[in-house]
Amino acid sequence: MATTMLNQDKMQMFVERYLELSNELKYRKGESGAYLQLGEILTQKGDYDTSTKHFYRAMKIAEETGDGDLKEHAKVNFGMANASMKWTNHVSNIL
């Protein structure tokens, strides 16, 4: 488990750097892909609130750039992360 978290942390660091570079270069498709990857990493970590924000950003940028596949991928992940967040909150309230 500790190794998995360490790998996720490293991956997050690399993707955040990729996002910075994409922003500097104004590479919008790179930005949307980075937001999608960050959302997936944060979902795995259980940070559903932040992951849904990243998926939303990925969706919006993909829409602007005409990347329909990435937009749909981000939309599905947004829905799954949102449902997981609601389920986690529901279970916490019960317990």
Enumerate the predicted regions with their spans.
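Residue at a conserved register position within TPR or TPR-like alpha-solenoid repeats
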Residues: 2-5, 35, 42, 82
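Short coil/turn linkers that connect adjacent helices within long alpha-helical scaffolds
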Residues: 6, 21-29, 45, 61-69
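Tetratricopeptide repeat
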Residues: 11-18, 51, 57-58
